[in-house]
Design a protein with these regions (language model features):
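Segments forming oxygen-rich coordination pockets for charged ligands
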Residues: 1-214, 221-229, 245-249, 341, ...
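Short, catalytically relevant binding-site loops at active-site mouths
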Residues: 193-195, 216-219, 237, 257-259
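Short amphipathic alpha-helical segments
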Residues: 199-201, 223-224, 243, 262-266, ...
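ADP-ribose/adenylate-binding Rossmann-like module
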Residues: 212, 249, 254, 260-301
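Short, charged/polar "capping" segments at the starts of alpha-helices
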Residues: 217-221, 293-296
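Glycine-rich, highly charged phosphate/nucleotide-binding loops
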Residues: 227-237
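Short amphipathic alpha-helix with an adjacent loop that forms part of the alpha/beta core around
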Residues: 235-246
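Adenosine-phosphate binding glycine-rich loop
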Residues: 282-283, 288-347
Length: 347
């Protein structure tokens, strides 16, 4: 089974508790900066005896879980939004950690009236149907379906901004919006043995995963249970299969040199036409192969009229240099490079 978005267990527990009449609270990181263990968007559901998710772990998380349980036991339904400073010398709001970062944590005891929003959020994550989670001091917890979000003022700006996964406005009239589903989409072009191994590794890394191949009845594609989407396509139409976006990652590993070349020509041509504000339609574009093979592919792209600047966007040979040999080892080296691309601002 494909892995669901990381937050799904949080909302599933919250929905089940509300249906059963069991007190439950949500914890959420609305802002993070520096070396904060909890990143923006991290969430937990907390009951008297169980939890789902995480807001960063350690003593800070333990204290917030205990505070949530105290609120649930006392029946205090007032939300609490508080900064947490991970420095010993901080004059206030010390978290008990020394990571040197900061995060704003929201404690939100859920009420029966929240069930409709919680259920809708759970369903959107299960089906990958999109929409927005919206939290605010003024309107509480809401789910906005895609069509509504597109006409909802400030949310409309986020809906049309491919980079706008989370948006937070601090202060007394605080507000938080988050696009539901996976932030990052990984497309593997080629459905062979390394593709299958990479799919299994990427399943744990919170990617929405698509695997494409031009070969029907390919056993390694048919048996790929980690991919959310599997399609047999004509590589001449590859550009139409991969929408542009700053959270799009593309790994090319087709059956051979010729099909790699076809795919890369179309994707680099797409790069000329579909640039994002960052100047390139994809966060990552790489091709698997030996140094000799990749050099030959680059030569072919030059012969096809692509500039050195355009060709420089292509990464290859892909994977961190860990002397990998087996499909599983190669997959781990590629996954590590994808993480590097995800976390490096100047990648």
């Amino acid at each position: 089974m494909p892995s669901p978005p990381r937050d799904l267990p949080v909302w599933t527990l919250a929905a089940a508790c509300l249906r059963a009449g069991t007190p439950v609270a949500l914890l959420a990181v609305l802002r993070s900066e520096g070396s904060s263990p909890g990143r923006q968007g991290f969430k937990m559901a907390v009951t008297a005896d169980t939890v789902a998710g995480s807001i960063g772990g350690g003593i800070m998380e333990h204290k917030w879980v205990e505070l949530a349980r105290q609120r649930l036991q006392s029946g205090d339904a007032m939300p609490l939004l508080r900064p947490q400073v991970h420095r010993r010398e901080a004059p206030a709001d010390r978290s008990g950690m020394m990571c040197s970062g900061e995060q704003d944590v929201l404690l939100w005891p859920l009420r029966p009236t929240d069930l409709a929003a919680v259920t809708a959020i759970e369903s959107a994550l299960q089906t990958l149907s999109g929409g927005f989670l919206e939290w605010s001091a003024a309107n509480g917890l809401r789910f906005l379906p895609p069509a509504t979000a597109a006409t909802d003022g400030a949310t409309a700006a986020a809906a049309t901004d491919l980079a706008g996964f989370c948006d937070y406005q601090a202060g007394a009239a605080w507000g938080y919006r988050e696009r539901l589903g996976f932030r990052d989409q990984l497309t593997i072009v080629g459905g062979g043995h390394v593709s299958l191994a990479l799919s299994n590794v990427a399943a744990a890394l919170d990617f929405e995963l698509t695997v494409l191949d031009d070969r029907p009845n390919l056993p390694t594609l048919d048996s790929n249970q980690a991919a959310h989407h599997r399609r047999v396509i004509d590589y001449e139409n590859i550009a139409a299969e991969i929408p542009a976006g700053p959270h799009r990652y593309v790994v090319v590993m087709t059956v051979g040199y010729r099909t790699d070349a076809v795919v890369l020509r179309h994707l680099l041509h797409r790069a000329r036409q579909g640039r994002t504000r960052q100047g390139h339609p994809y966060r990552y574009l790489g091709v698997m192969g030996s140094t000799v093979k990749v050099a030959e592919l680059r030569w072919g792209l030059r012969e096809a009229g692509f500039s050195e600047t355009e060709i420089a966007r292509l990464r290859g040979p892909i994977g961190l240099p860990i002397q990998s040999q087996t499909p599983e080892e190669i997959a781990i080296s590629i996954a590590a490079e994808l993480i590097q691309a995800r976390r490096s601002a100047d990648f």
